[in-house]
């Protein structure tokens, strides 16, 4: 562990259109090779598509999707006595949100088709309805933590 000063947490700015920190975090996760304008366009087009399809506020759909994909428990590998145990740990809210955003984007990128706007909007709508690969990944992580509950006493 480093003995130097700990890094100061930076505050997350809000995006200019929806004034939401969550949308800004999503745009930052979409970002590839520094093309921020493209990331903004992808996210805003996906939001318009969600609004057109569901007739609901797109921010509420995105927030519900992230909430449904956010894990509460994760497992961490810990080596003890020559064997490796999967130790269940609680997830901090910031990490949970970051994992949910990462999984939603990964699931959207792995969908078939070429149109990223359609893939992202469909994954967000699926996650808000508690289906889709991002929610499945969260459930899988919870199942692994439940299966390894016996090792919860081990310190990480």
Curated annotation (Swiss-Prot):
<dbReference type="Pfam" id="PF00177">
    <property type="entry name" value="Ribosomal_S7"/>
</dbReference>
<comment type="subunit">
    <text>Part of the 30S ribosomal subunit.</text>
</comment>
<dbReference type="InterPro" id="IPR005717">
    <property type="entry name" value="Ribosomal_uS7_bac/org-type"/>
</dbReference>
<dbReference type="InterPro" id="IPR036823">
    <property type="entry name" value="Ribosomal_uS7_dom_sf"/>
</dbReference>
<dbReference type="InterPro" id="IPR000235">
    <property type="entry name" value="Ribosomal_uS7"/>
</dbReference>
<dbReference type="GO" id="GO:0015935">
    <property type="term" value="C:small ribosomal subunit"/>
</dbReference>
<dbReference type="GO" id="GO:0003735">
    <property type="term" value="F:structural constituent of ribosome"/>
</dbReference>
<keyword id="KW-0934">Plastid</keyword>
<dbReference type="InterPro" id="IPR020606">
    <property type="entry name" value="Ribosomal_uS7_CS"/>
</dbReference>
<keyword id="KW-0150">Chloroplast</keyword>
<dbReference type="GO" id="GO:0019843">
    <property type="term" value="F:rRNA binding"/>
</dbReference>
<keyword id="KW-0689">Ribosomal protein</keyword>
<dbReference type="InterPro" id="IPR023798">
    <property type="entry name" value="Ribosomal_uS7_dom"/>
</dbReference>
<keyword id="KW-0694">RNA-binding</keyword>
<dbReference type="GO" id="GO:0006412">
    <property type="term" value="P:translation"/>
</dbReference>
<protein>
    <recommendedName>
        <fullName>Small ribosomal subunit protein uS7c</fullName>
    </recommendedName>
</protein>
<comment type="function">
    <text>One of the primary rRNA binding proteins, it binds directly to 16S rRNA where it nucleates assembly of the head domain of the 30S subunit.</text>
</comment>
<comment type="similarity">
    <text>Belongs to the universal ribosomal protein uS7 family.</text>
</comment>
<keyword id="KW-0687">Ribonucleoprotein</keyword>
<keyword id="KW-0699">rRNA-binding</keyword>
<dbReference type="GO" id="GO:0009507">
    <property type="term" value="C:chloroplast"/>
</dbReference>
């Amino acid at each position: 562990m480093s003995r130097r000063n700990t890094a100061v947490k930076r505050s997350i700015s809000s995006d200019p259109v929806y004034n939401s920190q969550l949308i800004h975090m999503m745009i930052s996760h979409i970002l590839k090779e520094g093309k921020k304008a493209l990331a903004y366009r992808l996210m805003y087009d996906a939001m318009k598509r969600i609004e057109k399809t569901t007739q609901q506020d797109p921010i509420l759909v995105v927030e519900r999707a992230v909430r449904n994909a956010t894990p509460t428990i994760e497992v961490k590998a810990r080596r003890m006595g020559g064997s490796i145990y999967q130790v269940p740990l609680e997830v901090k809210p910031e990490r949970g949100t970051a994992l949910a955003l990462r999984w939603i984007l990964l699931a959207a990128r792995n969908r078939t088709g070429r149109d990223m706007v359609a893939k992202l909007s469909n994954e967000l709508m699926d996650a808000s309805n508690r289906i889709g690969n991002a929610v499945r990944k969260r459930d899988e992580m919870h199942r692994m933590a439940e299966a390894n509950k016996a090792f919860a006493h081990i310190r990480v």
